[in-house]
A protein has these predicted regions:
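A fold-wide structural signal in alpha/beta-hydrolase
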Residues: 486-496, 656
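Structural cue for short, hydrophobic secondary-structure segments
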Residues: 465-468, 484, 494
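Mature N-terminal segment immediately following signal peptide/propeptide cleavage
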Residues: 75-107
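N-terminal organelle-targeting presequences
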Residues: 58-79, 99
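Peripheral, non-catalytic segments that deliver or gate enzyme domains
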Residues: 84-90, 108-113, 121, 128-135, ...
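N-terminal chloroplast transit peptides
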Residues: 1-4, 8-21, 30-55
Length: 717
């Protein structure tokens, strides 16, 4: 194994929780990211990658002593503000030259970007957001410019912004200043430090063209003049990638709407003709990771000829497999760690229930062993960021019962220095453990699930927390919502039902056409039965709770298995699949047919749509329902919540409906997040009998109540 010290790149193959901010090459996200773009995406996602997971926590060993012991017992109520307020620190990113650290931190109660010199504790704010906050940041390769994405009111039309971190008082510049357009697929390159590539759909809202940005020109005030069309989308391209040496766009992922296949296309130069490298038919999963340094090979992930994704080295001309580098039988490759210059694979990760790694480089393995030695026990260590020379790392430690903690790892001296804790206020409280468990569905399929509870001495009320997507998954690790439920006296169960990602193509596609009345929902029902049979759950007090697809599953559970649930909480969940798909954003257009294949053809089969859409089964609902919705949600429109809430109200079925006019697909503003959770907590106490903190709406919350407004209008008429 090579021990040459070169810059290494971390390629994620799993869902990104925030807008993509990887420093070098964004291609590795394509296939999974596109599948998830076509979905409604989880409101709360797991770590972005086994190597880049931005979540952590711990008591470090062999470091200056610091007490992180909880000062309370599990009986004390953990305030909602502690669980759901803004983190004090998040998303550390080391500048390529290794001198500075950028991170997120509240400024006047809103998350903004700060910078400090590494080794110092003086923080300087460099952005001035006063509304929704910034949720991710990365460095340009010039080591002075910071890049971040921002939308308006949750509309998800993210623009790419840049700010000069070294110039005091510098104003952020919108690098993609097109009204109504969306920017994504950002790529930077160390050989071209003054340039950024970004895809924008300003020419055609359904197609993303690749633009090249002249950073110095943009920062000087000419953002439009700094943009040059680099590669126009010929149609069907849903993602772009580059060759590192030239920084030319030489990779494209093309979706064929007719058969839902995806094709990786490549070219030899910017002027060259595109040619097909490999096609993944519907039912197969795969993506390109990178070109190899030899110019004759590429790294791919593929399920073709196997059940789970394997990491392959393939011939660039024939796509013939030269080497199977890594694979497991029960789960996909989750992350790939590359040498940025040689493209040598230094490590890969897998995650069936817990994170595992396989190393191909002795130095990298030794570094992770050292981090495990210095960090806490029972924690998953990840690299959040690295300097270009790899001498300075920002690392995090993920465990199940405490807040994120970050440290700086000196790769030369093999020493670890505390950096910051994401939410220091959480250190004062005792959290519940999370256990990974196995549940066997009625047809014998094994499901991985995660159980969080404070009281294991007797059956307690159960909350089934359903992840979004549905083409996503839950992970082991600290989850504020699960901890909240456990602290209030409930057991919380999270299930990776069939159709979840990460477990191979058969597991994924066993969810096809199985929404609502099919086996995807049966898996959730079977999980509840398991918890009851195991003495975990009080079968008379079960709640189903979820966001996005999880919100749909809540509505489905309330309508199709009404005897099972005492109450339900639906956050931005669709109630009518046909109207959902008729109102998706235009840039999802190339993926609509793929969604029809996965969900079922609700366009052609009206009866099928009615069968799986909870809106048509409102009469079956027996239990109270709480609905939360963002008015600006571009994925699940407000109408999805309106129509079922109004129909339930008309029929006298108990329903509460809270609408936030300044939110989208979930709650970005802490005041709204805390507000809705406060209302949820009182709802759960009323119907399940758990504990609740007193509730006063936060001053900045914007909750409105459409059912009450409708009744007021009706009364006046």
């Amino acid at each position: 194994m090579s021990k040459t010290k070169r810059s290494m790149r971390i390629a994620s193959t799993t869902k990104a929780s925030l807008p993509h901010t990887t420093r070098s090459h964004s291609w590795p996200m394509f296939k999974q990211q596109l599948v998830l773009l076509a979905a409604f995406a989880a409101l709360a996602s797991g770590p972005a990658s086994a190597f880049t997971g931005m979540i952590a926590r711990p008591v470090f060993r062999n470091m200056p002593p610091r007490s992180l012991q909880a000062s309370t017992t599990s009986e004390e109520l953990i305030p909602r503000e502690v669980l759901f307020g803004n983190p004090e620190y998040a998303a550390p990113a080391i500048s390529p030259d290794g001198k500075y650290l950028a991170f997120l931190k509240p400024d006047d109660g809103v998350l903004n970007v700060f910078v400090r010199r590494i080794g110092e504790d003086v923080d300087r704010v460099v952005t001035k957001d006063r509304v929704r906050g910034i949720r991710g940041v990365s460095w340009a390769e010039d080591s002075k410019t910071l890049l971040y994405n921002q939308d308006k009111g949750g509309d998800e039309n993210f623009h790419l912004y840049a700010v000069d971190a070294m110039a005091a008082g510098s104003e952020a510049v919108d690098l993609t200043p097109f009204e109504g357009a969306k920017a994504q697929n950002k790529i930077t390159n160390k050989r071209f430090p003054n340039e950024v590539l970004v895809a924008i759909n300003n020419r055609d809202p359904t197609q993303f063209d690749m633009y090249r940005v002249d950073l110095p020109k943009a920062l000087a005030g000419d953002a439009l003049g700094a943009l040059t069309l680099d590669t126009e989308n010929p149609g069907g391209v849903v993602g772009w990638g580059t060759e590192d040496e030239s920084f030319e766009v030489r990779e494209a992922l093309v979706i064929n709407p007719a058969d839902s296949s995806s094709t990786v296309k490549i070219r030899d130069s910017k002027e060259g003709e595109w040619r097909e490298l490999i096609t993944f038919p519907y039912g197969e999963e795969g993506q390109m990771i990178d070109f190899c340094a030899d110019g004759e090979s590429a790294l791919l992930l593929s399920t073709i000829g196997r059940e789970t994704t394997a990491l392959l080295k393939v011939d660039l001309k024939t796509a013939e497999t030269k080497e199977v580098i890594a694979a497991q039988d029960n789960c996909n490759v989750g992350g790939v760690f590359l040498d940025d210059d040689t493209k040598e694979v230094k490590g890969v990760s897998f995650n069936y229930a817990r994170l595992e790694r396989e190393f191909f480089d002795d130095d990298l393995k030794a570094d992770f062993e050292k981090l495990a030695e210095l960090g806490p026990s029972n924690a998953e260590v990840s690299i959040a960021s690295k300097s270009r020379d790899e001498k300075t790392w920002a690392v995090s430690f993920r465990r199940d019962d405490g807040p994120t903690e970050y440290a700086i790892y000196d790769q030369t001296s093999k020493s670890l220095s505390p950096l910051f804790v994401s939410s220091p206020s959480q250190l004062s409280y005792k959290f519940a453990p999370m256990s990974d468990v196995r549940i066997v569905a009625r047809d014998g399929l094994e499901l991985v699930a995660y159980l969080t509870r404070s009281d294991s001495s007797k059956p307690t009320p159960l909350i089934l927390l359903v992840h979004g997507g549905p083409w996503a998954r839950d992970y082991w690790g600290f989850t504020p919502t699960a901890q909240w439920f456990a602290n209030r006296g409930y057991a919380c169960l999270q299930v990776n039902f069939r159709g979840s990602t990460g477990y191979g193509k058969s597991f994924l596609h066993k969810g096809d056409k199985q929404w609502g009345i099919g086996t995807m929902q049966h898996d959730l029902t079977d999980a509840v039965a398991w918890a009851i049979n195991e003495g975990i759950a009080d079968g008379d007090n079960v709640c189903i709770y979820g966001g996005s697809y999880g919100g749909y599953a809540t509505l489905a559970g309330m309508t199709f298995t009404p005897e099972l649930y005492k109450c339900g909480v639906d956050i931005v969940g669709p109630s009518n699949i046909k109207t959902l798909l008729d109102s998706i954003p235009p840039y999802w257009g190339p993926l609509r047919n793929d969604m029809l294949r996965k969900i079922g053809d609700v366009d052609a089969d009206e009866d099928f749509n009615k069968a799986i859409s909870p809106l048509y089964h409102v009469d079956k609902i027996r239990a109270p329902l709480l609905i939360g919705q963002g008015a600006n949600d571009p994925r699940v429109k407000q109408a999805e919540a309106d129509q079922i809430a109004f129909k339930m109200s008309e029929k006298g079925i108990p329903v509460e409906y809270v609408l936030y006019p300044d939110e989208g697909h979930g709650w970005a503003r802490p005041d709204n997040r805390i507000d809705f959770n406060g209302r949820t907590e009182l709802f759960l106490k009323k119907h399940l009998g758990g504990r609740a903190e007193s509730f006063e709406p936060p001053e900045g919350a914007t909750a409105t109540f459409p059912l009450e407004e409708r009744q007021d209008i009706a009364a006046k008429v």
